[in-house]
Amino acid sequence: EAVIINPIQKKTAAFAIFVDSTTNARIGKAILDYRNAVEYDGLSAYIIADNWRSPDEIKAVIIRLYKAMPPLEGVVFIGDIPIPMIRDAQHLTSAFKMDQERYNFQRSSIPSDRFYDDFDLKFDFLKQDTTDHLLFYYSLRADCPQKIEREIYSARIFPSVKNDSKYILIEKYLKRVVNQKRETNRLDNVMTFTGHGYHSEALDAWNNNLTALREQFPSLSEPGGRLTNLSHGMSKNMKDIVLGELQKPELDLAIFHAHGDYDTQYLIGYPPAENINDNVDAIKLFVRSKMRDARDRKKSIDEVKSYYQSAYNLPDTWFAGAFDDSISCADSLYSANLDLYSCDVTKLAPQAEVVIFDECFNGCFIKPDYVAGTYIFGNGTTVAGIANTVNVKQDIWSDEFLGLLSY
């Protein structure tokens, strides 16, 4: 049976905290403290706990609260809340295009809480996932608006771990939020990073980025303010530089414009060759990786080798050592130093309270060790991550209205 805790404060707008019954039973005090902090911020806050059986169940409650007084303006989902997996809606994404008939449901569907916060979108229920009981598949109906215009905002507090440690992580996070809401900390320290492989290759495309950020955050130009703008081409050791910046105590906001995967932030790519030997080494590294890839995919290694030899007239010696343990290890370490992985973030204490991941898949919360989650539930001070569950174009206006954070 659902547990509903009504607001204490009468405000002009409301906020709803949805939580599963087990999480509420385990860390109920932390959730109550979080509710009180939200109300201190100026919102009437509900707590609704239940053994939720479907997304439709939750959406019905959301719409009811939206029509009540004071009207609902936003929701947060804590713990094991059903996850809508949307199909037949790829035209609403900027870059996610996948054959729904060729690939399985989980891979070709989009985890999206637009199911909950855009009331005009209509869906037909398809099925519940057989391996992950939190996933529910829906098809977007053709007779509803084919654009996203949300009535409310929404967010998730959802660690990627499956064992009981998730309750500890959620509790620690909620305590962090409560403590930060008691502090006065204006946004006057920002780091931006632009990765390799898209329009950041053209520096003219970022010519006015610093100007825009200083207009959005005037405090960056005041004494004590700081704006650090990093580009992938500045250093071959960019990973160490980014890691160092992320751990500076004064950092308030970090913005990443780069390629990504659910557990990876792609930073610099392979650096350009400076001489002939660099070019040869780069080709050797490339063909060794292709041979290992063929082995891992159970394809013919000889066919792959033959293809690259005939296509690029490469000698046998350039393929040597592909499966040698020491060379494989060296290649792996070299590649690992180019990018930022979830396992790197877990060793850090990221200090930015807000991180924007303008990168593919970083917010895919159905995956283990998804990047945004490692920041949120890590050892630092991050309380908000804005990320994508699927791939996304990097030439969209990802920081529109960002200046609102300065108020």
Model region roles, listed by residue range:
Residues E1-Y407:
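Cysteine-dependent hydrolase recognition
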